[in-house]
């Protein structure tokens, strides 16, 4: 089934200057609605940040796209992400790279993210609970 909202978002990202086809394809493949609470799923393809849990937010899609495009990721790359959140950005990075290492300080968010990765069968993500302190 074609999701008109997702198509509209991809077009909006293109109009905003996102040109990397791999980035746009990764965003199209990852269902953003899986990464937000049920109460906000109807807004999941609007270009806005949304609350997730623990007073945290999922980034606005244009921010995710700009950051991802700026990385110039290649499939052979390994990526370190600080702040997993619900796992949306992590999932996009996993499509574009060989492996993603991600750390999250809030355990409940990490558990949610790990469940999201399992649902999407994303197996190249290594998670860690912690604040990054050595």
Give a label for each model feature.
Residues 39-52:
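Short, surface-exposed glycine/acidic/tryptophan-bearing loops
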Residues 72-134:
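Conserved nucleotide-cofactor-binding alpha/beta core module
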Residues 1-39:
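N-terminal auxiliary segments of SAM/dcSAM-dependent transferases
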Residues 8-11, 15, 47, 58-77:
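Conserved alpha-helix/loop element of class I SAM-dependent methyltransferases that forms part
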Residues 21-22, 62, 108:
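Cytosolic histidine kinase catalytic core of two-component systems
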